[in-house]
């Protein structure tokens, strides 16, 4: 039984040793824990924070670029809208100018027509007045010539028989008849 007890003792010792190996010693555990804490602190302080800071900066840079792009896009849309508005206003003004010019041209044509018509009417009136004046002058001169001719004829016929008062009466009668 010695052999069995030895084997059992050996087995127990091996098991105990394996058990101790399974759980490290407290100083080794504390040293490992301290190394882990120092490593975590070192990694956090020298790598994680700078990387996080750079990522945050990059994220902010990207966001700023996106915001700037959106702002530029908005400004571009506003400028486009303003340009379209100005273009429409310019088209309206051009249309108004063209319409105004057409109206002015039509008014000028109408004024020239009216002026020409007035001038032609004035010329016609002057011509009619001139014709009337010439007719009156012709009638007056004709009467005078007829009266002169009648007087000469009457004098020749009645030279001896009619006195000058009677002659005037005849001339006045002839003048009076010719005026009618």
Swiss-Prot record:
Keywords: ATP synthesis, Cell membrane, CF(0), Hydrogen ion transport, Ion transport, Membrane, Transmembrane, Transmembrane helix, Transport
Superkingdom to which the source organism belongs: Bacteria
Any one cellular-component term (Gene Ontology): plasma membrane
Compartmental location: Cell membrane
GO MF term list: proton-transporting ATP synthase activity, rotational mechanism; proton-transporting ATPase activity, rotational mechanism
Membrane-spanning ranges: 26-46
Keyword Transmembrane set for record: yes
This protein's record includes keyword Hydrolase: no
Membrane topology: Single-pass membrane protein
Signal peptide as annotated in the record: none
Family per record: Belongs to the ATPase B chain family.
HAMAP family for this protein: ATP_synth_b_bprime (MF_01398)
Function: F(1)F(0) ATP synthase produces ATP from ADP in the presence of a proton or sodium gradient. F-type ATPases consist of two structural domains, F(1) containing the extramembraneous catalytic core and F(0) containing the membrane proton channel, linked together by a central stalk and a peripheral stalk. During catalysis, ATP synthesis in the catalytic domain of F(1) is coupled via a rotary mechanism of the central stalk subunits to proton translocation.
Oligomeric form and interacting partners: F-type ATPases have 2 components, F(1) - the catalytic core - and F(0) - the membrane proton channel. F(1) has five subunits: alpha(3), beta(3), gamma(1), delta(1), epsilon(1). F(0) has three main subunits: a(1), b(2) and c(10-14). The alpha and beta chains form an alternating ring which encloses part of the gamma chain. F(1) is attached to F(0) by a central stalk formed by the gamma and epsilon chains, while a peripheral stalk is formed by the delta and b chains.
Protein name: ATP synthase subunit b
Organism: Mycoplasmopsis pulmonis (strain UAB CTIP)
Species classification: Bacteria, Bacillati, Mycoplasmatota, Mycoplasmoidales, Metamycoplasmataceae
């Amino acid at each position: 039984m010695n052999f069995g007890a030895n084997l059992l003792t050996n087995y127990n010792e091996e098991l105990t040793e394996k058990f101790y190996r399974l759980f490290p010693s407290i100083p080794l555990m504390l040293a490992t824990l301290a190394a882990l804490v120092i490593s975590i602190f070192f990694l956090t302080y020298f790598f994680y924070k700078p990387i996080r800071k750079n990522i945050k900066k990059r994220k902010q840079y990207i966001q700023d670029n996106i915001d700037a792009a959106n702002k530029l896009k908005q400004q571009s849309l506003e400028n486009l809208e303003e340009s379209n508005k100005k273009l429409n206003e310019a088209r309206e003004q051009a249309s108004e100018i063209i319409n105004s010019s057409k109206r002015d041209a039509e008014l000028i044509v109408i004024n020239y027509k009216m002026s020409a018509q007035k001038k032609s009417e004035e010329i016609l009136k002057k011509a009619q007045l001139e014709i009337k004046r010439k007719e009156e002058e012709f009638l007056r001169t004709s009467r005078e010539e007829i009266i002169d001719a009648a007087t000469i004829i009457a004098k020749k016929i009645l030279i001896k028989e009619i006195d000058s008062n009677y002659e005037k009466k005849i001339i006045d009668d002839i003048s009076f008849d010719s005026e009618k």
